[in-house]
């Protein structure tokens, strides 16, 4: 047989033996396909041949997920990158959290009759993350939480007498006052009742936005008090600031620390400050910034002053955790036991004093001021 004819017939035979696969342009949802179970990629979707009635057709397809490798943005005390710092701080905390075993104890729970169990379950998820994170340093023999909503006032007053909760209240106030203070009721308080670490939380608010950080925030206060001692009440921004930072990091988890979630939360904290503090920060004057930072001790009192610490102290903590890691922050807390001076504490733990830190911190904080 002629060699050219043999080659032609061989090619024809091969082409007839192969199954016909339609071009990508013919692959679309609802179009006819030939064999059930086969797949075809068209554009950014993978289509599967399925049975629809008596016909074999392509399904709606599944979009291919695009995984973007995280970019490691270099940061330093002289380069507090606005994206790099939140990401690095978050990574440092979550790395520790993921390597921590589940704590071996559960809180004792007292729940008001009007509280919905599903709402409690939401809170416990964030609280358990805080328990696990701080367990190597703070592991009380007993820890109790009290969850209430409007309508549980009488029950809470009785429970207060039973558990000794009145020591956690501001002078002259009752738990009924606390429940009725805000609408909806979402406030919380942490402290020690009859030598037992305790926090009380009102759950009338939905588990959304900043309310997700409340449980981890309050539990961080218990860690601070136990591991750092009472000196924390006399130093600026640490108590509420670090509780704020670990509250939002553990409460919002898992989340993108450069997303609108963090931005919205910081906006709310900034807006809740007194106008004098807002004016100091907006002035972008370094001396006014330093003076304001030094006014943020818990003993100054008042919700507006607490909001200053929530905001600027949270950012200060974020920077320290990003640059020097989680373990160094724990060391910083331990040093508070014997050192009541912020400048000396920073020098002892991080190697620089208060003024130096504030000078480096200020531009990072100013950049977070809402437009």
Protein language model regions, located:
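Sec-dependent N-terminal signal peptides
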Residues: 4-13
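C-terminal segment of classical bacterial N-terminal signal peptides
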Residues: 15-23
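Tryptophan-rich substrate-binding surfaces of secreted polymer-degrading and adhesive proteins
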Residues: 24-68
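Non-catalytic architectural context of zinc metalloproteases
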Residues: 67-208, 212-213, 351-358, 364-369
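Second-shell loop/turn segments in exported
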Residues: 109-121, 200-210, 228-233, 300-307, ...
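Sec-exported extracytoplasmic/periplasmic mature domains
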Residues: 131-139, 220-229, 247-255, 321-326, ...
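Zinc-dependent metallopeptidase catalytic helix centered on the HExxH motif
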Residues: 183-281
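Active-site-proximal alpha-helical
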Residues: 270-355, 366
